[in-house]
Amino acid sequence: MHSAKNEKCNACGGYRFSVNDGFKYCDRCGALFENFEELEEEEGGLQQTVGQGKVKVRKNDDQKRVRNNAAPVNLPKAQVMREALEKRSDFLQQQAIKGEELELPHDATPDYLYRLALRLFSFTQILAKSGHILVHELNFESRVQENILATFQKYLAHCQVAFCHSEQCGNDEHLRFVAVMENLRYEQEEREEKQRKRMAKRGKGVNALSKSAAAWTLLTQGNITEHLDIASDEDGDQDAQGGQQLDDLTLETTQNPDESIRVNDTTMGFVRKVTTALSKEALRRASQLILNLEMLVAILHSALMSSGYQTILTSDVVRWIREDRFRISRRSIRLIRQSQPERMKQGEVVKPTIVDYAEPFLRFPLYEIMRTCTIFHQSLKLASSMAPQSFESMSARLVDNLNLPSDILSRMLILESIIPCDVSPQLLKQVDVDMGYNCGQLAAMSPNVYYSGFLTSFGRKERGTQDADFCDEVLLSPDAKLIAYLLLTLRLTFQLDNAQCALQDDQYFDVDSWIHQLEMRIKCWQGHNMSLVMRSSSHVPEMVVDPPFGTNYLFHQEKGAPQVSCRRRQAGFQKCIPTEMSFNSTSTLPTVFDVRHMGLLTERCQMEALISPVKFQRTVLGNEIERDPLTFENVDRQSKNTFFKHFSAFKTTESCDTFEEYFPCAKNYLLFKRPDWIQNCTARQTHFNPVTGPIRFYLSNQSCDDLLGTAATSFSRRFQFLLDALSLIIGEDKKAVYAAFVMLEMHLTSSERIQSIRDDLLTSSPITLKCQKFRNSTHHIPRKYGVISEVPIDRIENLRYFRLSRQFFEHEEMPTTINMELIDYRNQEIRDSVTETEVQRAQNRIMKLCYEFEQFFGILAVKFW
């Protein structure tokens, strides 16, 4: 029953009432509405009393009929639309729920608990949805769906936030988590309690009067109300005390039958105090647990590997997420992010540099994502449950995707037999999570050092913010190693650096035609207009334009002056396909841009579209030509034939028996330019370790940039295109792919040096390493140091740290950007308080040690490969 506008329940604030036996009750709480009197119907209408006034509603059919007849017949169209909109708005307002009736579930929940529950629920929902799509739409086996959730449960148990019996604190009151909340329903509960007592008194009084033997005496005394109220108050107090004791203490049975934990929920006026069975440490760990798309990639990839899929790479899972195959919405990504503004207000975080806050949409190169996946795999120790990856099967899949002859696969396998490769996603030869922090230790860290702890998870030295991007780790993924083998195979087989590159015979493989096909298929995959791509007279511009300062640099205004800042992680990466995450399936508004469709949904679910996206473009373009043949009438016929040409059955050379016959260009093989020195690639285990070690050698961003920048001037156009295109396919930065190529190249061209380094490391013999010690930009001193492994090892896989043969202080890498005096000196902005003597002393303190490239990179090649 709808009430009048000013009728409102005094107990709960509801607006709906029901009439029963002459009384009006609230539909929401059942409270009695006292100011109500039911009247009789008169004159076809109904009268209701609200407060002290009367509202009379009459039905007059004659007047209504006359009013309708008097309305104009031909109304303007605008007026008709206006009246229709008014009626529709009135109807929607009547159907809408009033604000007083709407109870939000998080109104009575603390913000941190509500945010924590949202993160766990949203991430679990994404995992369940991804598993369902993999099984029911992409035709993976059903056990994948179970392995995904089981892997996530194992991750939560490792971080001690699975909320199981082992994480409960028992009966120790000091370790329990106590939630102190505001009782938002205090006034409502107080009104309901008064109304309940009032109704209980009336009921008890009537029962006492009907059962009493001296009922006539009570009626004749004149004070019946006083006696009944006193009796009702005494009974009500006893019942309330017993009910309060039962409501406050609730027994919760744990997995251990001999132990029971009391959960105390006490409401004291405006404050509600809930003493839970969980420990405070578990809640703190759960609040800073890593839950982002990088962790989603790690869980999905490990679950697929645990299900027996050996050829699925990390780059495949990343590409599926970017292609919107799992239909992850922006809202879901927003919910799994940590509450950064709240943490900044509490003083836990100084700057917005939290792991999953700076870049939530996977705009990272592959080596950045591999860091998170490696931490996940090594922390949970999943190597025993994951199927081992085979180099042969992954190489065969790569050759098939690129439409290369089968002879290329045999040559790649020959190279792998000469130079064995570790293709395990664990990356134990490169890094060890025990050298830094695992996932459980990161979750237990203090919030203010949580981000730096994640970046130094492999034992790197903490750096300043201005030079940190040069010192971060670059991990070589199995995807990058496969591309390195393919590049070296092509360079040893064909003369990529010369004008003439293939035999003039239709039976043999033409590498130039294949490069042209690869270029067109990549542009088709990127979404270019193929009617323009296959015309020789048309120029097709690139879709992605590099920013002036680089993708990792931000331009902003600070106090009216332009500033450029660098992010610690390599965020903003767009050298991949697709360049951004697509939210087409979950967006509410259609796109306004003319984007070429990448095929039907049924075609996108084919296994070829999942595993061989480059090869799948022939299906996409073939369907596009069938739908609109007129658009492709004026294209170059030779380019069209090259696009659909099959190169898998072609021969590369004649029958081969020796290494020189398999690789005819090995005799005249030329090395690209390499730097003479390498820097910013060593780090002590901790600041408190002696300067002689233990020291870790790693591949840094600056060393990769120096290596690629030095060699780029000697690249041929064919090799430059292949490096860019193959890096684009796996979504990796080309500097990491080229670093892997140089390491593989050193194993083949400098095999004696590599073997000597390997023997010295296994026998703990000092390795002579030339160095240059720089005090300023012009003065340097040559040095020689001996490098040995920290402990005797019997396998290269056990190599972790190094030690220097003698103590010296010059190996400390102190970049010039840390010292503010030197920054001011170089910018010619010396403050008045800084004297020339202080500037000279600062220059003498700045020391930088550069290592000989060939020897140092040879040590990394032995360790990484």
Curated annotation (Swiss-Prot):
Keywords from the UniProt entry: DNA-binding, Metal-binding, Nucleus, Transcription, Transcription regulation, Zinc, Zinc-finger
Residue intervals of every RRN7-type zinc finger in the record: 1-33
Stretches with biased composition (Low complexity): 239-248
Location in or out of the cell: Nucleus, Nucleolus
GO cellular component, one term: RNA polymerase I core factor complex
The keyword Transcription regulation appears for this protein: yes
GO molecular function: RNA polymerase I core promoter sequence-specific DNA binding; zinc ion binding
UniProt-listed InterPro entries: TAF1B/Rrn7, TF_Rrn7_Zf
Composition bias type Polar residues, residue spans: 252-261
Region (N-terminal cyclin fold): 112-348
Residue ranges, annotated region (C-terminal cyclin fold): 349-496
One matching Pfam family: Zn_ribbon_RRN7
Disulfide bonds: none
B-linker, as annotated region: 100-111
An example Gene Ontology biological process: RNA polymerase I preinitiation complex assembly
Free-text function comment from the UniProt entry: Component of RNA polymerase I core factor complex that acts as a GTF2B/TFIIB-like factor and plays a key role in multiple steps during transcription initiation such as pre-initiation complex (PIC) assembly and postpolymerase recruitment events in polymerase I (Pol I) transcription. Binds rDNA promoters and plays a role in Pol I recruitment.
Domain topic, free-text comment: Although it shares weak sequence similarity with GTF2B/TFIIB, displays a similar subdomain organization as GTF2B/TFIIB, with a N-terminal zinc finger, a connecting region (composed of B-reader and B-linker regions), followed by 2 cyclin folds.
PANTHER family to which the protein is assigned, alphabetical: TATA BOX-BINDING PROTEIN-ASSOCIATED FACTOR RNA POLYMERASE I SUBUNIT B (PTHR31576:SF2)
Recorded family membership: Belongs to the RRN7/TAF1B family.
Identification of the protein by name: TATA box-binding protein-associated factor RNA polymerase I subunit B
Organism: Caenorhabditis elegans
Upper taxonomic lineage: Eukaryota, Metazoa, Ecdysozoa, Nematoda, Chromadorea
